[in-house]
Regions:
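Alpha/beta enzyme core
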Residues: 1-173
Length: 173
């Protein structure tokens, strides 16, 4: 993880996203000046263990646990945390109680910023669109048309190659 993190930073990454890494890993990366953004609430990789793709922190006990987890991530050295599908009031309270950046994904406007995937924003998510996603423009048909045109262009190229149509003086020396 350390080697790859430095590689990504060297090629332009601003931060490494560590969804559900251990505090030990986050501390080790912090000690090597690798900025880490972490993830609490609905962490998709943990869906099997948390009851599926459902909101987290809806009871007082679970909300407190998300706050404690966020504070532990802060102590370990994370520079920020994504709060995914957490009740807006819980996300707002957490944002006020931590010193690191908070990003909301389906957790209301009380965080420091918002986080959505480009394919959701642009409307070309395949399958079920998450409830917390917001589509701003529906590019699905345009992307499908563009993909069809790409395929057709390569078919034409293949045909010209098979039929030896590269003797045009405009493209040969």
């Amino acid at each position: 993880a350390m080697k790859l993190s430095h590689k990504y930073l060297d090629i332009g990454a601003d931060v490494i996203y560590g969804g559900n890494w251990s505090y030990k890993w986050i501390r080790a990366l912090r000690d090597e000046y690798v900025p880490i953004n972490s993830h609490v609430g609905l962490v998709p990789g943990n869906a099997t263990w948390i009851g599926g793709f459902v909101a987290q922190g809806k009871t007082a006990d679970k909300a407190i646990r998300i706050l404690e987890h966020t504070l532990e991530l802060q102590e370990a050295g994370a520079i920020g945390v994504e709060l995914e599908v957490v009740p807006p009031k819980v996300a707002e309270v957490i944002t006020k109680k931590v010193d690191i950046m908070t990003l909301s994904m389906g957790s209301g406007s009380g965080c420091d910023g918002q986080y959505l995937f480009a394919n959701d924003v642009l409307g070309y998510t395949k399958g079920k669109i998450p409830r917390h996603a917001r589509i701003y423009k529906d590019f699905k048909k345009e992307f499908e048309k563009l993909q069809s045109e790409r395929v057709n262009a390569f078919k034409e190229f293949h045909s010209d190659t098979v039929n030896k149509k590269f003797n045009d003086p405009k493209i040969t020396v």
